[in-house]
């Protein structure tokens, strides 16, 4: 059936308990294994889409939100329709499915708005997966259990699937807490989403002073905070989960849950990626976070007794990302600039250099 969300017409099906056969075939469905909503994104990278879908089929979550923007050209439409067919015909377990299929290309941010309006009207928690994020099978149960355990604990803003170190050997539980994490494969609550989009902090000089003090060792975060306080876009992007999750740490003193063993691998660093370059144009220190090894976790989970941020993990994670490390930061900027020039991306390199060099403008 088609439904209208705001001013946009999209396609949605199998909502509110309605069930229909897949591909015209009636068959006995396997039972779901994990009672958790999952949002997946259809795009134009077949090597990513199929690999992720096979993991989802093994995990068998109870609810799927399938977001699919339209193509920008005939070739993209061909791939998108193939991926839609895969989801339409190969979901072989009992699963409530919400399909958000656009009939044209609306773009990243408009599609996110449409999805969020539907998603958060149906559920109060959700795993968020982009098409290039490959989880371990146990990741789904890991998220489901912690989403329930911490649903009313407002000290926690999200559950991360990624551990930047791969394994945190010193951690004595199956997960720990951090003020720094990753949005690659996160699970959040509606209460987390309800914190998004609030930029009133920019109107209060006192709050801005506090935020400047809190971010004195993170120039990148401070530039974003200043930029979004007065503009909808920064470096060509609207504020999204990456900004708001980080802001939750600085502005709301919230923490993120990080698994002891990494459970997410991003395999989508290519010219089809929205937020990252082709991997050959990334500094070597950043390349390590892509195509990471993933691990399965054993159950029952061993929970930490105390809610304390792991400062050593934060330091190591921030060095990988060149946060709070000016020498590493500038060395990578130079390396990135050189790689872009080498591979014929001079215009893009100059734009990135401008954004890096110009100071943050306070409101």
Task: Walk through the language-model features, giving the residues of each.
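Generic extreme N-terminus detector
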Residues: 5-6, 26
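Peripheral/terminal regions associated with large enzymatic or DNA-binding modules
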Residues: 24-129, 133-363
